[in-house]
C-alpha cells in the first residue's frame, strides 16, 4: 500500500505547532516531514512548489538554529536541482526556475546574515551555472567567492569553488586560468580534509587538463580511473559515468581500443555499460577501431550532446575526425595524378565543400603536394620526385637569373 501524499498544508501545520519547548523528537518529526514533502515535489518535477515550501517554513529555521537550518535548506534546494527537466522549452524554463530558487535563497541568507549558508549556496550556484553551460557567470561568481574564501581560510569550500572555476575556464578556452584554479584546489586538498566527492572532482578535472593540454593520455586515464572509483564509492552514478566515458576516450587517443572489451567487462564497470553516454563514446571508439570515417561522422551526428557539445570529448574528436578524413583523402588520391573533387567526396561519403576545405588545408600544411584546379574542380597531384625537386629547381633558376643580371650589369659598365 502506497504512502499517503504529503501536502503543503500538513507541513505548515506541523511547523506552526513547533515552539522553543518542542522536544528533539518533535522537531525531528517536523524536519522529516519537510524533507519527505520536498522529495515528493522533486518526483513531481515541481520546482515552484519547492520554492514555495522553502519560503513558507522560514519560521522553522530560527527554531532549529543556524547550522541545522542551513543543512535543511541545502537539502531541499538539492532536491530541486536534481530534477530532470527534459529538453526544449521545458529545459530552458527549468534552468531559470533553478537559478531563481538559488538566488532567492542566497538573498534570504544575505539579508539574515547567514554567511555560511550564503557562501555554500553561491558555491552550488556556480556548479549549476557550469551544469547548464553558463560558463561566463560561473567564472565571474567563482572568482569573487574564491577571494572571500581565501581570506576566511574555508579550505573545503574553496576546493569545491576552485574546481568549478577550473571547469568554467577550460570551457572558455582559458587553459592557463583553468590550471591555476586546479592548482589552488590541489594545494588545499593537501592541507585540509577533502570529502571523497571533492577528491574525485579534483581527480576528474586533473584528467581533463592533462588530456587537453599535455596530451598525456596515460596520466589522464589514471586520474579518470581514480575519479571513477571515488564517485562510484559514494553512489554518484552520474559523475562515475562521466569518468568512465573519459577513460574510454583516453583509450581511443592511445590507439588502444582493443582493450575496451576487457575494461568494460570489469565487475565494477558492467553496471554502467547501458548508459547513453557510454553507448555514445563506444560508437566513436568502434568507428575509430574500424578506421571508418563514415561511421565516425555518423556517431558524432547521432550523439551530438555527448560527443560534440561535451568539450572534453570535442577537443579530441575534432582532431580525430580531421586525421581520419586526411587519411581517407590520401588513400583515394594516391593512385592518381589528377582527380575530380566530386569523385573523392563520393568515395569518402561526404559532400564536396568539407572535402575541398580539408584538401586545401593539407596542401597548406604540406601534407599533400599538389593544387586545386578551381576551373575543372579537380585536384592536381604533383609527382613525388617532382615535388621533392621543386625547391632545388627553383634555387637553380634563381642562380641562373642572378648570373644573367650580373653579366648584363658588367656589360653596361663598358658603355659608360
Curated annotation (Swiss-Prot):
Q: Which UniProt keywords apply?
A: Proteasome
Q: Which family does it belong to?
A: Belongs to the proteasome subunit S9 family.
Question: Per the UniProt entry, what species is this protein from, by scientific name?
Answer: Caenorhabditis elegans
Domain PCI per the UniProt entry, residue ranges: 217-386
Q: Does the keyword Transmembrane helix apply?
A: no
* The keyword Nucleotide-binding is assigned to this record: no
Q: Which InterPro entries match?
A: 26S_Proteasome/COP9_Components, PCI_dom, Rpn6_N, WH_DNA-bd_sf
**Protein's recorded name:** Probable 26S proteasome regulatory subunit rpn-6.2
Function of the protein: Component of the lid subcomplex of the 26S proteasome, a multiprotein complex involved in the ATP-dependent degradation of ubiquitinated proteins. In the complex, rpn-6.2 is required for proteasome assembly.
- Subunit structure, briefly? Component of the lid subcomplex of the 19S proteasome regulatory particle complex (also named PA700 complex). The 26S proteasome consists of a 20S proteasome core and two 19S regulatory subunits.
Gene Ontology BP annotations: ubiquitin-dependent protein catabolic process
Entry GO CC = proteasome regulatory particle, lid subcomplex
One Pfam family per UniProt: PCI
Q: Which GO terms describe its molecular function?
A: structural molecule activity
Amino acid at each position: 500500500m502506497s504512502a499517503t501524499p504529503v501536502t503543503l498544508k500538513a507541513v505548515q501545520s506541523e511547523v506552526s505547532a513547533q515552539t522553543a519547548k518542542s522536544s528533539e523528537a518533535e522537531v525531528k518529526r517536523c524536519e522529516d516531514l519537510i524533507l519527505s514533502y520536498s522529495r515528493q515535489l522533486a518526483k513531481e518535477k515541481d520546482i515552484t512548489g519547492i520554492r514555495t515550501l522553502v519560503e513558507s517554513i522560514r519560521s522553522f529555521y530560527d527554531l532549529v538554529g543556524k547550522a541545522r537550518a542551513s543543512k535543511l535548506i541545502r537539502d531541499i534546494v538539492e532536491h530541486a536541482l536534481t530534477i530532470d527537466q527534459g529538453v526544449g522549452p521545458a529545459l530552458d524554463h527549468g534552468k531559470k526556475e533553478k537559478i531563481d530558487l538559488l538566488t532567492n535563497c542566497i538573498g534570504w541568507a544575505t539579508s539574515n546574515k547567514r554567511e555560511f549558508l550564503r557562501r555554500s549556496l553561491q558555491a552550488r550556484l556556480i556548479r549549476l551555472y557550469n551544469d547548464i553551460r553558463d560558463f561566463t557567470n560561473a567564472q565571474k561568481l567563482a572568482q569573487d567567492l574564491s577571494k572571500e574564501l581565501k581570506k576566511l581560510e574555508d579550505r573545503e569550500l574553496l576546493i569545491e569553488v576552485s574546481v568549478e572555476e577550473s571547469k568554467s575556464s577550460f570551457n572558455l578556452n582559458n587553459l592557463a586560468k583553468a590550471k591555476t584554479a586546479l592548482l589552488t584546489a590541489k594545494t588545499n586538498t593537501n592541507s585540509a580534509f577533502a570529502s571523497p566527492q571533492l577528491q574525485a572532482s579534483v581527480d576528474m578535472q586533473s584528467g581533463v587538463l592533462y588530456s587537453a593540454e599535455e596530451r598525456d593520455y596515460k596520466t589522464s586515464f589514471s586520474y579518470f580511473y581514480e575519479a571513477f572509483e571515488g564517485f562510484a564509492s559514494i553512489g554518484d552514478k552520474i559523475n562515475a559515468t562521466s569518468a568512465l566515458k573519459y577513460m574510454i576516450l583516453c583509450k581511443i587517443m592511445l590507439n588502444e581500443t582493443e582493450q575496451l572489451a576487457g575494461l568494460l567487462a570489469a565487475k565494477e564497470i558492467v553496471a554502467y555499460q547501458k548508459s547513453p553516454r557510454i553507448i555514445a563514446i563506444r560508437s566513436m571508439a568502434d568507428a575509430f577501431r574500424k578506421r571508418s570515417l563514415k561511421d565516425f561522422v555518423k556517431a558524432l551526428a547521432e550523439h551530438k550532446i555527448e560527443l560534440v557539445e561535451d568539450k572534453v570529448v570535442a577537443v579530441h574528436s575534432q582532431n580525430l575526425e580531421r586525421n581520419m578524413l586526411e587519411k581517407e583523402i590520401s588513400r583515394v588520391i594516391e593512385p592518381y595524378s589528377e582527380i575530380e573533387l566530386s569523385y573523392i567526396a563520393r568515395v569518402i561519403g561526404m559532400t564536396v565543400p568539407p572535402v575541398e576545405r580539408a584538401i586545401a588545408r593539407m596542401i597548406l600544411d604540406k601534407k599533400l603536394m599538389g593544387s586545386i584546379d578551381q576551373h575543372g574542380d579537380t585536384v592536381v597531384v604533383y609527382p613525388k620526385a617532382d615535388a621533392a625537386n621543386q625547391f632545388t629547381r627553383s634555387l637553380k633558376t634563381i642562380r641562373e637569373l642572378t648570373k644573367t643580371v650580373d653579366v648584363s650589369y658588367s656589360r653596361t659598365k663598358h658603355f659608360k
